[in-house]
Amino acid sequence: MERLSSIDAQLRMLVPGKVSEDDKLIEYDALLLDRFLDILQDLHGDDLKEMVQECYEVAAEYETKHDLQKLDELGKMITSLDPGDSIVIAKSFSHMLNLANLAEEVQIAYRRRIKLKKGDFADENSAITESDIEETLKRLVVDLKKSPAEVFDALKSQTVDLVLTAHPTQSVRRSLLQKHSRIRNCLVQLYSKDITPDDKQELDEALQREIQAAFRTDEIRRTQPTPQDEMRAGMSYFHETIWKGVPKFLRRVDTALKNIGINERVPYNAPLIQFSSWMGGDRDGNPRVTPEVTRDVCLLARMMASNLYCSQIEDLMFELSMWRCSDELRMRADELHRSTKKDAKHYIEFWKKVPPNEPYRVILSDVRDKLYNTRERSRELLSSGHSDIPEEATLTTVEQLLEPLELCYRSLCACGDRVIADGSLLDFLRQVSTFGLSLVRLDIRQESDRHTDVLDAITTYLGIGSYREWPEERRQEWLLSELNGKRPLFGPDLPKTEEIADVLDTFHVIAELPADNFGAYIISMATAPSDVLAVELLQRECHVKTPLRVVPLFEKLADLEAAPAALARLFSIDWYRQRINGKQEVMIGYSDSGKDAGRLSAAWQLYKAQEELIKVAKDFGVKLTMFHGRGGTVGRGGGPTHLAILSQPPDTIHGSLRVTVQGEVIEQSFGEEHLSFRTLQRFTAATLEHGMHPPNAPKPEWRTLLDEMAVVATEEYRSIVFQEPRFVEYFRLATPETEYGRMNIGSRPSKRKPSGGIESLRAIPWIFAWTQTRFHLPVWLGFGGAFKHVLQKDIRNLHMLQEMYNEWPFFRVTIDLVEMVFAKGNPGIAALYDKLLVSEELRPLGEKLRANYEETQKLLLQVAGHRDLLEGDPYLKQRLRLRDAYITTLNVCQAYTLKRIRDPDYHVALRPHLSKEIMDPTKAASELVKLNPGSEYAPGLEDTLILTMKGIAAGLQNTG
């Protein structure tokens, strides 16, 4: 126990002053670390364990004293290791950071429970506390004087659609995620009140077993995941938390309504929460997403949905054993009973024919047969492409599944058994309404250019010219005349390139599969009305019976500025207005706009574009839904959910919100039951609050000031990123961007075009690379110049900026997120990368950027009125401090590994290897080196590099 107390003491030194005594984070952290170090000692010997502790201590000293010599000392220790040892060290620190994340998740859930018991607010994520649904409803009724009926009406009609995307940043393998989930559960149980000594011992053993199993699992994906892999990984969250979480959450909403005096439940068909997905539908820049992949993914989702329903319907059959029923149900049950001939031996329960005096079971057994057939048909279609089960024996629409369940519900209520009806049957009805037969609706995303290619091929084939070269007016005129006409445009003899066939086959897949598989058709890089009409025409030509809604996506700064005018032109087309029936969705992209103009200008332009788009829609009497394409990182629009929603412009949400939930954020949102519950709660509560109590509209003088700042910020950002001739070379040298492609994180290439500068780099690797060196350039660059400009112009502007920070949620959130990124950043680390990797003549550029970083941070604190970073959020500050020493060790390890990879003349004297292997103590950890035979670098270097990348990503929690 002595050692545990020494780790404990070391960790306690890092705690900021304002953290309360009942905070359990240090205890959790110390316990997991101690168990891990014991395991490390057992597996690899004392020397290696001591090395890990020494590295940690030197890094912790650097963090407290900021003495740059400590980084050199750490560098010497790490570079003297042999390849096998350096893999073990990198793996150990990466593993310790994953454990720290788990301790934190358990801690957040624990503080939330304490808070609910005490009934007070503990600041969780920021100055503005997130609320649960109950607090929100009470606040709306008590403080904001809304009537309970108004609140109920608003809640019933609102929809939050969470769109899961497989972003290449989910850096943790599923094999590890499952082990992490078990470690989390052990930790929760170990600290529960009523635990016996025997339980404690067994749980502790289980904890050690899971920590060791995770450590012994290869963290690195040795093959790149296919889109089908990504989709299966995304769907695993439905199995594990979302499926059961939704009805549980909706029950909590019922309870919250009861507490404000509404004695009704949320109707089961109220679309409070919906789920969609891009996995296997997003083909923008990902050649691996083919029409076959889309078809597979839809069938797989249908199979999974019917499987989940099958597993639950037997429980429902057990529950509904009543014999009293309505005449309507009795007639249906008798009819079904007469037509059922045989026993069903392939079921475990209720395999004999159900007797007529159990009418509900008769009805449900018929539903079960159809679900079984639906599942088997999807399975057969998936594996061989055809099925002997006729489609009429399966469920093809969600109404077919809802109808018999609704019949049971009505009958129970009519017989005075409403209490029973409101049990599992209501949960089941709510699941069917939420998930349908396809579990999630798949969005299709494609670049507008690809549609232009297809139409160009068609017009050339018809001999009427080149669509690509036509001006917008001519394009619209032709598209509308075709849409109003009846004749087919082209036959099977249309000459097609592979790319064109791919686009058309995608539409054929949409036509072939049931309509409820699909959500929206999103056009990226959309600029003009013809982009939208083109997709409408192609859907018609490929015989899509229920056309998908077409959603333009505006990303680049110039496109965002032009978006309102483009939408107005689209709405003024009569044909289109009739087609959309008063509803339109528009997607706005956060990633590319940030890469194009910097964070400040992008955030402000997104704000203004939304206001104007809503205004255009109002003028035409259209209800507009905004679809927010936010990343997990701040540079790509991430940040705490409730704040992001509450800081949107007034009137822009209006009860309907679509948001992407990406890669690593899926794990943080749905990885565990409590987290999943909190996520659903946050989105629902914040959307309701934004609609019923919109944030203040900014004052005209705030707008003028921000407009002026945005111009300066964009100028400063572009003058460095796009106009500084040495910048691209500096970026490639100072970060691991070139090596990023080797990580096998996602199924899509990291570049849109193989050669070229920053423009062709995807937003994700661009952010990922800067996050790795803890310099976060894309997030803050531009803020400093903007602040400096307005303060030099008139010092009274400082007062106005502070007023904006205190009174305008949007501005506050923008500044708070950048402050959080500064708290995670470390220019000393970035300087180390420069010293080791950047050529002599480029170093002054790095120095100039670091001076800019320091100045921006100073100005930002002045505007926020803070003396220190994060002084308003001691808990976040504590969490960041606890992990700094681990991340620093990984940074030093990464910088020196990059040096060894890139500089063939860089040699160091290696010490004898430290690590012992259990099976054969004479064998070093060099076995690890053989896991990667295809590496083009010296043995062990590539794996060490990848492990440091994954570790730093886990530590900073906002990868790309």
Swiss-Prot record:
Its cofactor is Mg(2+). The keyword Manganese does not apply. InterPro entries: PEP_COase (IPR021135), PEP_COase_bac/pln-type (IPR022805), PEP_COase_Lys_AS (IPR018129), PEPCASE_His_AS (IPR033129), Pyrv/PenolPyrv_kinase-like_dom (IPR015813). The active site is at H167, K595. The keyword Translocase does not apply. It catalyses: oxaloacetate + phosphate = phosphoenolpyruvate + hydrogencarbonate. One of its GO terms (cellular component) is cytoplasm. It is found in: Cytoplasm. GO terms for molecular function: phosphoenolpyruvate carboxylase activity. It holds the Pfam family PEPcase. GO terms for biological process: carbon fixation; photosynthesis; tricarboxylic acid cycle. Its EC number is 4.1.1.31. Gene3D superfamilies: Phosphoenolpyruvate/pyruvate domain (1.20.1440.90). Keywords: Allosteric enzyme, Carbon dioxide fixation, Cytoplasm, Lyase, Magnesium, Photosynthesis. Pathway: Photosynthesis; C3 acid pathway. Belongs to the PEPCase type 1 family. Through the carboxylation of phosphoenolpyruvate (PEP) it forms oxaloacetate, a four-carbon dicarboxylic acid source for the tricarboxylic acid cycle. Homotetramer. This is Phosphoenolpyruvate carboxylase 2. It comes from Sorghum bicolor.
